[in-house]
Amino acid sequence: MRVLVLALTVALVAGNQVSYAPEFAPGKTYEYKYEGYILGGLPEEGLAKAGVKIQSKVLIGAAGPDSYILKLEDPVISGYSGIWPKEVFHPATKLTSALSAQLLTPVKFEYANGVIGKVFAPPGISTNVLNVFRGLLNMFQMNIKKTQNVYDLQETGVKGVCKTHYILHEDSKADRLHLTKTTDLNHCTDSIHMDVGMAGYTEKCAECMARGKTLSGAISVNYIMKPSASGTLILEATATELLQYSPVNIVNGAVQMEAKQTVTFVDIRKTPLEPLKADYIPRGSLKYELGTEFLQTPIQLLRITNVEAQIVESLNNLVSLNMGHAHEDSPLKFIELIQLLRVAKYESIEALWSQFKTKIDHRHWLLSSIPAIGTHVALKFIKEKIVAGEVTAAEAAQAIMSSTHLVKADLEAIKLQEGLAVTPNIRENAGLRELVMLGFGIMVHKYCVENPSCPSELVRPVHDIIAKALEKRDNDELSLALKVLGNAGHPSSLKPIMKLLPGFGSSASELELRVHIDATLALRKIGKREPKMIQDVALQLFMDRTLDPELRMVAVVVLFDTKLPMGLITTLAQSLLKEPNLQVLSFVYSYMKAFTKTTTPDHSTVAAACNVAIRILSPRFERLSYRYSRAFHYDHYHNPWMLGAAASAFYINDAATVLPKNIMAKARVYLSGVSVDVLEFGARAEGVQEALLKARDVPESADRLTKMKQALKALTEWRANPSRQPLGSLYVKVLGQDVAFANIDKEMVEKIIEFATGPEIRTRGKKALDALLSGYSMKYSKPMSAIEVRHIFPTSLGLPMELSLYTAAVTAASVEVQATISPPLPEDFHPAHLLKSDISMKASVTPSVSLHTYGVMGVNSPFIQASVLSRAKDHAALPKKMEARLDIVKGYFSYQFLPVEGVKTIASARLETVAIARDVEGLAAAKVTPVVPYEPIVSKNATLNLSQMSYYLNDSISASSELLPFSLQRQTGKNKIPKPIVKKMCATTYTYGIEGCVDIWSRNATFLRNTPIYAIIGNHSLLVNVTPAAGPSIERIEIEVQFGEQAAEKILKEVYLNEEEEVLEDKNVLMKLKKILSPGLKNSTKASSSSSGSSRSSRSRSSSSSSSSSSSSSSRSSSSSSRSSSSLRRNSKMLDLADPLNITSKRSSSSSSSSSSSSSSSSSSSSSSKTKWQLHERNFTKDHIHQHSVSKERLNSKSSASSFESIYNKITYLSNIVSPVVTVLVRAIRADHKNQGYQIAVYYDKLTTRVQIIVANLTEDDNWRICSDSMMLSHHKVMTRVTWGIGCKQYNTTIVAETGRVEKEPAVRVKLAWARLPTYIRDYARRVSRYISRVAEDNGVNRTKVASKPKEIKLTVAVANETSLNVTLNTPKNTFFKLGWVLPFYLPINNTAAELQAFQGRWMDQVTYMLTKSAAAECTVVEDTVVTFNNRKYKTETPHSCHQVLAQDCTSEIKFIVLLKRDQTAERNEISIKIENIDVDMYPKDNAVVVKVNGVEIPLTNLPYQHPTGNIQIRQREEGISLHAPSHGLQEVFLSLNKVQVKVVDWMRGQTCGLCGKADGEVRQEYSTPNERVSRNATSFAHSWVLPAKSCRDASECYMQLESVKLEKQISLEGEESKCYSVEPVWRCLPGCAPVRTTSVTVGLPCVSLDSNLNRSDSLSSIYQKSVDVSETAESHLACRCTPQCA
């Protein structure tokens, strides 16, 4: 019994241990049938697809424990390109034969429990073929768990290690085991792929990918297995891989790749499978092995037999095809050359260079192609050629820049770039060294993006450079090194950078501010990898309020680049509530405000945090003017398409000046789930404005500075600010990397000026002129590999899949120039000789460009390609032949365009999407199928004359669009391809014999789905053709200009007018109209209808050759006349083509009643603002009228128009009495020598001050022309009449400009009136009117619905004051007005006009003066009230008889000092100005202001006074005296009996000090004392700027001095008895003097212990540096009386 129980137990345990893992029994061979294929294209049927199929028998047998052999039998490789599913796969017989040796070779693999381990193969099997074996073996990879039926795990496969989901189901009835394995390709921990191109420049946008995807894929495998005791047998396995890709979100349609594999069990052979007798070496695991995929471009498949010979052939083809003209296929040939160079060995490239380096064209193409190789081989070649000196500096710069961006970053490339930087040829050229160094940083960054754990040793050489430069205090070297570290963005660089930042490095304070800013900006890229580390540093910089505001604002830019969390943004907001610097406050607030509206996904959390922060802050911060720093950010993101763009701009100022100190701007693009900083630039200027405007000829006099400093010596602890050194810097970033920068200082500017004025530039100019005279020709071509973006990854079949974008271009130009000069120039000629010569030049220029762009998705292996390819080919060529002649002495200029034969298409653009299948053994049999099948259609054309384009262009476009109406698209069946869109638009100018046509042909897949990707896929073309127009042959187009007396000789068509005949014709028309119209109508009405009728008939003159067109024209004319007549009956307003303004005066009495009634009806709804403009308008008084006596005002109100009419009627055309002063001919020279074109003649009559311009058509019997008559009726009025049409009678406008007065202020009024205008001008005017209305409302311009004259526009501009205008614009339906429109400059009127007399004859100085005056900062003192430069008002009690510093230059230059003294007896202010080497005193005396220069009084009769240098002027203004010295920083100092006014120029802002403040806009830091401490009250601040007396015998009678006062009582501070002294000294009488007047002031007191030895005799400097412990009230003396015995 026990034996039976034991047997049952053993059997039960054995039954539970059945293995589900596949097992292959030793000694047997398992035969399977394998088939796998890949198809790519759009998912819909009826479109073309491309694919590859692999079929074979598969034999598997055991080779040992856990070791197996796999062998293929009868493999077949097929390709597919055709309409799916109609076409079939076509076997690639030659390719199969070529690969059969490798495919039939068995491979070994480890296999245990369903998991494949290592793979072994002989060396003869290439990596590409072995990957195919891996794709097959992947079908047998399975991790089966006995205890679970549903589970997830990270499984190794061909594509790497990805998340895999298992479902196991056992069918006990059928004795089958069903397994489903699904692999999510979007969640791989170790994905096998290769990225080429933009990988180092883009940033992944995780938030964007959460909203949509551009690439998605999954693999599903179904197994049917038969379980057994020894293991399961795989009966069938089916795998399906689906991959979708779209650059604009796969939800909106995508190109897909579908791969399917099937393995079907066939039989078990009893014989074992034997391996080859060869060395089986380990070849990796089941993971796909990347090999030569980078070398193979998917655009074309090359069969390479002799790479050197093929390179030579390709190079010769490129050179020959692009000799001065870019061939259409050149970009593709260029890509072919690059592919061949990638395959070639380094020695072969060296041999090619040696062969072609002396041939300029071949050399040029080689140097442009080698960087595109994309490996360190290119860098090695470039380095060796630079070291050997075989390339020029320009060639080296081009090669370095190209290779930096195109070469794939690896350790070898980084070492080569590092070594290149230290080569002598590079170190000696500063520009090349900068390029190499910046490129080194870019290379490190690209490497670290692909290898996040890159070592810090990569950037250690730059760290060493920083250490050495810091020891030498070499700011330029530090700036370069910081930009390199900024490009690299390695976290290990944080410590070296921090050493250069104030507050972190001990030596940082000795460095220039620009170094601090560069160091801060270098943190930006590090912050994208380590945001927390950078946030700590940048926040500390911002919080340190002792640092320069510019540095703090740059730190904020760095902070926001790290995508701040809510907590930090709230911290910033709380800090701003107590921020004393308004520049910083304005910048941060505006940056936060801008981010509240962001729509980009990656900044959504920042936007939410900024919305909270803005609520914390006060909205009044937004009211700060644009003189304060600002940050701007605008963006837009379209979620459905995953497309977006963002732009940021930073305007950084430091003293509220007009010109900012720093400007930065950046543009970012979002595409396909990544973002890239496309372009960034910055410009920084410090002291540039000052360097341009301040006096340059002021001698650096030691005596002057000594005198200035002596006056300020008494100021307690006064500290001079450092003078600004003129410095400018520029930088440019492309794709987020610094590529170029420049620091511009005085030395560089001097070098540029020296070069521009030196003999070398003259020598070069002479050589260029000699080359032109001897004949110059050049044929130039330049290839560019602009974009190569590739994403390579394996498919489940083991074939490489590629998504790529290529752009290549070739530009070319052919130039031939021949010049002649008569008479010939002497050898030592001066450039002025050219102005006296007759210069002729012939030139032929042919610029051309060819651009190819390819987008590829599909299989790309060295032996077979099957892909969907979109290729765009753009080509443009614009050949020109021209001749020019210039004779300045004779005033003659001509320019001729000569026809170019054989050129029709000047521009073309084609885009097609095709399915391609080809293999390397059968390239001739490659099959290319359009994805959208082609279906021919007859095109419909619409040809237009250029003269009709403005009327009919829109109609023609819409008509041609009807070829494929929208409804037809919707009605098209699912499988029926709609007809293509075909359009042809032409414009013809018969005058010059040119016809231009645009042909459009388009067919796409939007009939299936209307999304962007479907719209792109198809065939599209656009052609721009220029051909000779039908008609007479044109030899050339010529432009001639003749000035002077010979202008009459160039007149080809005399313009005459038979006035009697014209008048007679008008009378006949009037008689006919008189019978039709009512008797009440006046003659002017008849004239208007007549004009309208003649206008209509003249419009059809061009078709008058045929009787039908003539009759239709007559009918149109008749109907037009009748319509005009009927409309005139309804409207009593009168028209006259002669002069609309004159008619207005004729009918003024008759229209007065209607205008008054209309104004009364509208007055009930008028507002107060309306009353303002009406008053402003009615007060306009003409200066022209004031020339006449008052008694004749009514008579002369029409004198201007009447005089114009009388002169015009007397002499219609000035050609009858004067010769033209200028003649311009723009004509086509016909073969039959008939005139064709236009003639412009300008006449001037001095007697009547009349200018007439006549534009006439040169065609015989064509009377169309434009006539413009301008006449100066007086010094205050100018009138212009412009008429055009046949005989200048169809259309009429009149413009009158006149000066006048509005409430005694100067004004200008311009009127535009018309009688009749063309339809297109009226339409355009309506659009302009709507635009003006919209813009006016947005800019605070008032608008009233007040009707004006129906055919008149009037603009009135009146002076409100020297800096503002009152503007009124009257239109027929609205009136716009703006009162007090502020100007950015002073008008040259009143006081400004008088001040400009000092610059008489120097208009540039006058303009500069008006601009600087408007930007000046102003300070005013009235009695004891001061209004500072920053517009802050305070009252002060001034010590008697003491001078105070009102304003001064606080730099070490001390360009000026303005002292103020209060005469307490007379209660008036006196000022003393120390400027340059003179002292100017101004003081009131006997109700007048007296001025002394160096102690000598200047009588008022001798004013204005001009200093000998010409930079200082003293003049009388109103009731006072003013001094002007803008080039010294003082715009104006003015003193009257009751007011003192000081104005400093804009570039002095932030550099002044004194009672008026710093003029820096910082009102929160207004009370700045001489030692730069901010006082707590105005009194202490004012007293700090008083100059104390030296002794009680001082002539100034200021018997006081500053003292630090000890607190009279002892206090307990922090538990210790202390004595306190004032840190803000107060005024006390000198020893021996007693106070007679005092005041109380609040002072801050630092305290020391009672044991301290500090007493009054000790130096007070240590006290002034201490912080304030307590505040107390102290007594300050204002007036003292001294005893005779005082010292």
Swiss-Prot record:
Q: Which cysteines does the record link by disulfide bonds?
A: 1419-1556, 1442-1592
UniProt keywords, alphabetically:
Disulfide bond, Glycoprotein, Phosphoprotein, Signal, Storage protein
Modifications made to the protein after synthesis = Phosvitin, an egg yolk storage protein, is one of the most highly phosphorylated (10%) proteins in nature.
Q: Which GO terms describe its biological process?
A: cellular response to estrogen stimulus; response to estradiol
Gene Ontology MF terms in the entry: lipid transporter activity; nutrient reservoir activity
Q: What does this protein do?
A: Precursor of the egg-yolk proteins that are sources of nutrients during early development of oviparous organisms.
Q: What is the protein named?
A: Vitellogenin-2
* Organism of origin: Fundulus heteroclitus
